[in-house]
Amino acid sequence: MDMSKMGGIAPQGKMPVCAVCGFNGAHWLGDHLDSHGGLKNYLAAFGSNAETMSHEFWSLASKGSAPAPRRPVKSSSPPPVNFCGVQFDINAGVPASACLPMPEHYRVPTKGALASDVEDIMISLKMGRSIWVSGYPGTGKDALFSAWSAKTRTPGLLFQVVQGADLQSWRFSRAFDSNGTRWEEGLLLKALRDGYKREDGTTVPYIIVLSDIDRATRSQLEELRSILDSIQGRVPGPDGQMFPVLKGTVIVATANTTGGGDDRGMCTSSQTVDSSIMDRFERAYKLSYMDPADELEILREKYPDFASDWPTVFPTMLKVIGNMRLAVAKNELFFEPSHRIVSAWAGAAADLAVVKGTKGMTDGDILRRSARVMVDKAPNQDVRSAIILHMDPIVPGGTISNSGSNNITKR
């Protein structure tokens, strides 16, 4: 052991005192000085004779029997997170503020077709594939990637396609200063090229979500084509230069359709997407509706008091919704019985219980009165009548009176 490189010796019987913070609780300061930049920097700052060891430590060290200085212990990485059956590492050091927000009351699907859909998407995400995810409104497309970003601490950005918006500004835009005009890099360009920089200086690649991509107009689709070139590992800059995309960056797109436009008349803002753009995505998936068992747990979590007081109302709602979804699949009902609709119906029932009380009411009374928040969203009278007809055999007491008129809003 080279004693000349270990610093000076404190007076016999005394502990060395740290010149930085005054610490004197050890015979040897070498381990303590790791928090102040290390022994070498300490001696450079306070002189080669600065006290770093006690007389007792020096005596043992000179005889070769002093304990070896401890190496700093590296902090352990957080355990991986399981997202629908697929394990993902957590990006330590990435704050929640840099990730997409965790949706309120979000539950990772565990049952039914949607759980299978999400597991396949997670496999593709694990492999860093570019993904197109479609599904009816309210099936949780954006929420899925927001939850994944939040749970894995993956930095994320969501860009929503709005008709008429300037998508080029996501990459760059003109800015003005005293010297005239200049190009100003946009948030998307910097995210694709630079990633997210942690406090320790290391970078973590982003997940980029392009939401409602099938709403893009023809001119917007041309800009999206340039953005999607980044899937090939490069992104165009303002002067035509090509920047490399940070390895590990993932681009996903969400849409109501599979790129062929709306063929049901329910999402009329959806446009036809050029096949050359669709081909840029390595994987494409269509989300199913959530399984009623998973939906029931979400409703119970959102409205625990009502669920406790009226334990059969929510299950009855979900039976109605399931019946409607079967009709949609057969093209017998032109409506979107999504989870948003279920939540609105359940919320209206819970609101009724809080504000007006439900004394003297039955399950059927509550279901009928609160159902108008769903029925009144129907686009026309034919659809409203069809919804009421699908409810009638399931709701206790029915929804159609003996005279044939509906009693959905009966007080």
How should these model regions be labeled?
Residues C18-C21:
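Short cysteine-rich clusters marking metal-coordination/redox-active sites
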Residues P69-R411:
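C-terminal regulatory/interaction module of P-loop NTP-utilizing enzymes
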Residues N24, L39-K40, N49, P155, ...:
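Short coil/loop linkers at secondary-structure junctions
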Residues P11-Q12, H27-E51:
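C-terminal recognition-helix end and immediately following basic linker
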Residues G38, N49, S54, D274, ...:
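Helix N-terminus capping/helix-initiation residues
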Residues N24-H27, G259:
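Short functional micro-motifs and their immediate structural scaffolds
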Residues M1-K14:
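Short, intrinsically disordered linker segments that flank or connect zinc-binding domains
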Residues N41-P67:
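Chromatin/DNA-recognition segments of nuclear transcriptional regulators
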